[in-house]
Amino acid sequence: MDKRISKSFRVIFSSLYPNFNEEEAKNSEKYFNFILANFPDRSEITLLKIVFFIFSFGIRKVFIKDKNIPRFVQNLQSSNLSLLRKLGSGMTALFGLSTARSLDGEGSVYKYLDYPIYKNTTIEKKDVSIPKSIEVAVIGSGSGGGVAANILNEKYEVGLFEKGSYGNGETNNETFGYHNFYDTNGIQQTRGYKVLLLAGMGIGGGTSVNWTTSLRTPDKILSEWDSLTGQDNYFNSSEFKSSMDYVCKELNVDVENNRIPQKEEKLAQGLELNDLSYKIIPRNTSNADCTESGFSTFGRYDESINSTNKVWFSEDKFEPNNVFSDTNIKNLDLSNGKATHINVENNGILHKVAVDKVILAAGSLNTPKILLDSGYRNKHLGHNLKLHPVSGVAGKFSDEQKPWAGTMPVSYTHLRAHETVRKRV
């Protein structure tokens, strides 16, 4: 079956990407097979493998000639049948990943874009000694766990447990970054329409691999949270807002840390020509001259970026021996509704750690999973996840743009439903 799947991949790939040479096609095929072997949701891959198996037989050419394969994939994506749309979306997403990434380094597609190419680097995992007990276990070292560990560390003995590793202080390529600093190699997707779910993994969590965008939660959203949770002015209270003030001050969140790079000058001009106002996005950096964040999502080290690791887990603020990297929390032991132990996997060995208190801040994907695996039962667990999908838009310009250069998101605007862009730059 694997040989037939590979045969179908080569036929479809050559039709969708006719300019790729043989070596580039082979690299893409290797990564495609890597996805098939490592995709978290096996049920999502089964349908695709069956279709590819059937597609490999010669009878297919009677109905779908090679030259018509691109149109066939487009028709799948726009089909009225949800199963076919799902198949078309899945094929497009996985083929796209196969061109953007490579097991040998940078994806083949970037050779055509004058894109900076970086070789695979290495991660040196630290040996950690898992304790028998800890007063407070904070699970997750990102924006939630980082704040919690920082505050609680003033009063309690805090152990920080993180699924990922420390950063390597290198500028990494895309494949290496996704494989080492994101959960499930950065290939996990939603069912149905294949929205890629990128969950940061490593000391600092998402704060170590994001673009440093630091937007405060708007008042209207805080009011919505109060309404949804039945709270009486909790999220919109002065106390809650002072907590945000504290975090923003500690991380040095400021619009002065952002500058409009060449790639967004045209966007700013277009907004101005259409009488649309825009604002500069504040960033959490300690140096206004830190203006390169194109590779920060792949673990690029920059001491100016104020991740939770830099701000709150430095040796002068947090006991380094209480930071347990590369530890996977399997579940919690419960007694009378209270967590008494956490079950921690490290280097293939399962450890049971006694705890007085647990702060579970493993992200919106893993937090409910750990609760479910621990025996918690609630109709909302594992449901009601809301995403804000991001879509890329490409433009052709007379001048070279280098979209990976400079800070990434620089400005934002509120475009209402009745407003349209009328004038061209």
Language model region names:
Residues 130-133:
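Short helix-loop-beta connector
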Residues 93-125, 233-331:
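Conserved redox-cofactor binding core of oxidoreductases
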Residues 414-425:
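Single conserved hydrophobic/aromatic residue that forms the stacking wall/gate
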Residues 338-342:
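Short, hydrophobic/aromatic-rich segments at coil-to-beta transitions
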Residues 135-159:
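N-terminal Rossmann-like FAD-binding beta1-loop-alpha1 element of flavoenzymes
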Residues 177-256:
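Redox-cofactor-proximal catalytic regions of oxidoreductases
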Residues 2-101:
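Flexible, low-complexity segments enriched for small/polar residues
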Residues 164-169, 174, 202, 345-350, ...:
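Glycine-rich loop(s) and the adjacent beta-strand/alpha-helix scaffold that form part
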